[in-house]
Amino acid sequence: CGVPAIQPVLSGLSRIVNGEEAVPGSWPWQVSLQDKTGFHFCGGSLINENWVVTAAHCGVTTSDVVVAGEFDQGSSSEKIQKLKIAKVFKNSKYNSLTINNDITLLKLSTAASFSQTVSAVCLPSASDDFAAGTTCVTTGWGLTRYTNANTPDRLQQASLPLLSNTNCKKYWGTKIKDAMICAGASGVSSCMGDSGGPLVCKKNGAWTLVGIVSWGSSTCSTSTPGVYARVTALVNWVQQTLAAN
């Protein structure tokens, strides 16, 4: 897991406001969640052939579709996989008022077929520590300006630093809970449409899922940290859910 066949290229300046276009296929765990009309509403990450992790607040249902292997949503020539969802497992501790424990697992009806452009991200251990200041990457098809009417066709990426929760509370106060992790305030920001997608950090040479795009500034301010579900705090629930299903 966590080692793309097609290597990502990060210029360093990388909403996803002020991000940049990704190399096609270089984030092979990134999926697009689309409703039955084909409208992209959230991102997600493949953690194996049968399971996708996303945000609970995305409100995914079994009538939605997981699209894997996609880069350009405006292209009809890509070898994408449209995968049906068998079951939605929303974390029972998810609180829609505080947006805490913002994680949902999707069990696929048909397994994804792994390839150069479709593969899994690594999950961290509950004990893993990703230090404040670590540069990580978030990806998605979310708005590139909060005022835009439409999301971009092509997958965007941005490098951004992790913050400590103590530091993050300077911006967000008591809204920041233990199952959240903040990143950004560095000239880039996740934005609407990125939700559910990955915040990944490299650990021992493999990209590891550290956060799930959750919430942030309503204007996708690049000087305010974005808030992500903290995967280390939720990974035990993930492993238990996979084991039981």
Curated annotation (Swiss-Prot):
SMART domains xref list: Tryp_SPc
GO terms, biological process: digestion; proteolysis
Residues that make up the propeptide removed upon maturation: 14-15, 147-148
SS bonds (residue pairs): C1-C122, C42-C58, C136-C201, C168-C182, C191-C220
Location of this chain's protein in the cell: Secreted, Extracellular space
Domain (Peptidase S1) ranges: 16-243
One example GO MF annotation: serine-type endopeptidase activity
UniProt catalytic activity: Preferential cleavage: Tyr-|-Xaa, Trp-|-Xaa, Phe-|-Xaa, Leu-|-Xaa
A cellular component annotation (GO) from this entry: extracellular region
Keyword Iron-sulfur: no
Alphabetical UniProt keywords: Digestion, Disulfide bond, Hydrolase, Protease, Secreted, Serine protease, Zymogen
Coiled-coil parts of chain: none
EC number(s) recorded for this UniProt protein: 3.4.21.1
SUPFAM superfamilies in alphabetical order: Trypsin-like serine proteases
Annotated active site: H57, D102, S195
Protein name: Chymotrypsinogen A
